[in-house]
């Protein structure tokens, strides 16, 4: 009697899991914008008490060379995104809702210059426009340059788990944390001096839990085996974005303390 009850309960659990996974698969196909916890901190930075700071980013590469971790075989896919400079530009434009930094294009400078040459030659050839009013505006030059990149990716920094089994019924859970580190330095264009350096680390958490049942019934002539589990892995890109945004936040705070820029002071009218 208990055997049939157990089989019925396991069937209900599996049907519930299949329904949940089906709904999740449908949801995962919809695009969404992932918001980090540090994004609100960047938007909440006080207003700048001077003219906007012009800053350039030529490259912010992955310097780790780390491949995706695998216990079975080596993978060709990289563990770190190959475009971290995109997140850095987004973070700079996010400071106080874009009121702090004017970010000039340098990563795609070749494409920008070619397009400007194409516009200029087309105007001269077909429109005959050579007057000063039709000349393209000069490119904005930056006063500061940010150099650096993703400098470290350490996998399996901390791992562990626990489990128990009684009369063929067991449950277990496992966890693992990786760590990614970024480093950036701010350079003055006029002198080439490194004004400050910033480093930030972010852990990447993974968690797995499962349960299983293995029982014999009908005088040990038949066996029942059921397994169920789920795993949650924090996206690597999310961790890199968080580390970069935190680095930009610390850069703003450190630069204000060193006197490179200042927060806007509000005057209370009497």
Annotated model-derived regions:
Residues 18-51, 154, 161-162, 174-270:
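C-terminal/domain-edge helix-coil "capping" segments
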Residues 53-54, 58-156, 179-183, 187-196:
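N-terminal segment of the mature soluble domain
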Residues 74-79, 122-125, 164-170, 203-206, ...:
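Short, low-complexity, polar/charged sequence segments that are solvent-exposed and flexible
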